[in-house]
């Protein structure tokens, strides 16, 4: 018997609370959908469901809208495959120039047959198209596409308490083709298999489309009636070629919001200071200047020409009905959801080559510089521009050369190269002979740059390797993104990458010398858009957002020479003695104007840059299974270089800032207040009179055009875009459609469910301030976890199978498989208890209210709820903390927790199955081979520094401060190589050992398992009582009540209320964290749980005299030491009591991340202050409680109530140095 799949009628659907009964009901229903294909089919296509065709309801802004479901005949009765859709050139050497379609055309899936002679071009083409339809459409992120769709539909059913809504009708019309699903994912074959050959080729992608539209509905971006507009538009695009049409119309479908803001006339907006603080609000006129508004007519005509008529009608209606800035924001978010289905756009590399990498000559060619000095190989050593755009850029960049050279001289470049190498793919594979030479283990590890460099370390100082790499073709690697066409990047091998490393090192020094570059310190929160918030709230500004179209393809040899000129100028002033195969030496050079050659001392950096500049423009090739080796024409800038982004950033700022200097020399004033550049994205802010700002903006655009770039500058007085972040009049309009919850570039098996949940949590954090309804997002994430991330399958030795099953089945649901006598092991699936989603080291997801034994409920946890060990407090909350305080009890309610499944979830976490896999794999890695490889690399870099680091770490260990190898500089190379070795898949032999060891652990743990407790659990025993004192909201509550600061911060919302209570970001704390993060090269990812900080802090608190050895061990220079010492001192303000929690910057975004912000909102009895650390600890309690319970907060003062055991614990630990882990990741 299948369980009742009527999720929408459950008690949980009505109350959004878990009673003991309703929890079991949801657990069983979601487990059924996770594990039973028949149940999924019945749930999605229940014959009793009503089918809607006409629907009326409210749109995003509350206006009535009517819509009719329309599924084109081209989708339900697709055409037969037509070979002429992918025409070949006459000589069959490639696709015909200007072919119509770059992506998968819509046709009947079964009509793509391959009847051509094997080995012919047509046979190979059809085999490739078959892979495009079956393999490249498979993009699932968390589970197979039908489970993901079930998660979305389940959340909609429960949220709206009905199955009667349009998206379900689309699902049934599109995918219900009998008792079987029309297609399914086959992980073993790594492809989609069609059961029904009559369906459209593109139909699997529409499962993801439905998931994305459902996500937009759940998160409040689309209403049900607007979902019809979205689905109708997507289906209209798919009549011919879905992705081609989507790419064609996406821009024009979103380009109307400036006109809508212009029409609004006046808005009240927040005013920001330059220190990321709201200091007031003002009325602003949103009317755009004539040179902007003059473009609106042409845009309207283009929309009418290109867009599906119903979608264009929706936009015209939005223009007509938008009366406020909030109206425009809501309609704009809806239109973005209607033009991006969140899928990663994939096609054959051969079809996308022209659009991705074919050289483009835009506007005009750049003149070349005059060569002033060259070497015997006729490579330029020094060059200069006398006129043109090159001269403009050089006039600005030349002012940095002396300081950049000084900084470059202070770098050990061989060591920097070793640190630059990662565990990513090395751009080539070992030949069979090379594999035999290095041995099987090392050959298996060599799929990483660091190991490949170690294998060929003996050749590092030989120039021949560089010349050899220059002759080898550069391989293309395809990359897919959401909402952008497929790209092709250059898969450079280590030697070719090395060639671009010195120009990268030189170029990136500029980042620290001016503030033009947006590279570097990205905090992940509103700090990143601080300048945009400030300038869009100012008067008399013109905001320019520039995107350079196809920049890599537009950088010609001549354009690249602008950067080469700067790099060679810097290199000529360096004194670098050695770098790879280059040694500083006297060389024969030729100078312009001198008849005889001269001998000149040329340092290593100069030699390296000269060779790179002379050989930086070679063609790329792609090994096509259809056409053989396809060579791209000369001229495209290889996008996989070390300095790709740096080149673009430095070049563009040279052109823009150089133009500013030229204008000054021509007697024209500068209106350029600031610029920010990252790669091919440019933000310019002009301030002054309307005419002056416009003339300067046009002048800059002209310079970029003269440099060979096609630029589209969006000018506005209201809005600015940089790095896909849109800010409008001091408010953030985040692009929710850019976050793909359900798809990824490459589908991969979910090995670690806890890591998959971390990924889900991170994606939801990204979405949180981009959506209007975080509560809907919470439910969506819950059902994703419950249906997509509950099943874990492992291989169990046949001899241990039954005993393993018997031990675990007491605590969780298991699925047994029939044993095959031909194999030693059999699969067993563990169905995780639903409560695993809410556990620390489990899912760490915000919990819905759980019923306690006395009938009361725990808090409904908001999406701002902290994660990490703090989630352990839920166990005590369910066990009733208030009662524990009253009865002075410390015991968990084991019986109730077991009934909910927390005991089984805790057991699963304690078993640590996934770490067992790593443990077994680690045992098989030869430490001798790892050491040999690391030693071969150490000879190339700072060998003495590494030995010194290891000695310092050894001395610390003797004094009781053992450091982990991953932070000791002297073991860094070993750790990288070890990581590469661990990335290989476990063998059958290893699986058997894992099974045996797991059986031993299970037998030990499951005899009488109870959730373990620790003395530190006392820190969770606090409560808050409401008092009748209404708390004042902070002043910016009023300033943000007119225009929504973000989509989830409308007046009266949880986001707005949390901001009104706690305030905004602590700038000084963020800057400090960014400084510390910069030491690790992990800007926005730094956490106080970072091992460098964590282990250093312990030494700082307990044995400060050992800090010098600590700094030597981690190889921290004077600057890094100062940063860490400041961070240690700042962090010590939190006291010595350990209380772990994790909040990500994106999860808070605008909200304060400083626990002190909660101090004014809570009354703490004086008797609780039993040590100097109490104030900081109690602020953390208060802060985390307000974030967690913001939905039920009534705006009144709270009183803290503590358990006697907590006070005793704080009193007893206040003098010992325990790391306070208020983690911010």
Curated annotation (Swiss-Prot):
Supply the Pfam families for this chain: CPV_RdRP_C, CPV_RdRP_N, CPV_RdRP_pol_dom
Sorted keywords for this record are: Hydrolase, Nucleotide-binding, Nucleotidyltransferase, RNA-directed RNA polymerase, Transferase, Viral RNA replication
Catalytic activity, reaction form: RNA(n) + a ribonucleoside 5'-triphosphate = RNA(n+1) + diphosphate
User: Which stretches make up the RdRp catalytic domain?
Assistant: 497-727
Determine the domain of life of the protein's source: Viruses
In short, the EC number is: 2.7.7.48
Among PROSITE patterns, the record links this protein to: RDRP_DSRNA_REO
So which residues are the signal peptide here?
none
Family according to the record = Belongs to the reoviridae RNA-directed RNA polymerase family.
What is known about its subunit structure? Interacts with VP6.
The protein's job, in short, is: RNA-directed RNA polymerase that is involved in transcription and genome replication. Following infection, it catalyzes the synthesis of fully conservative plus strands. After core assembly, which consists in recruitment of one capped plus-strand for each genomic segments and polymerase complexes, the polymerase switches mode and catalyzes the synthesis of complementary minus-strands.
Indicate what this protein is called per its UniProt record. RNA-directed RNA polymerase VP2
Organism (species): Lymantria dispar cypovirus 1 (isolate Rao) (LdCPV-1)
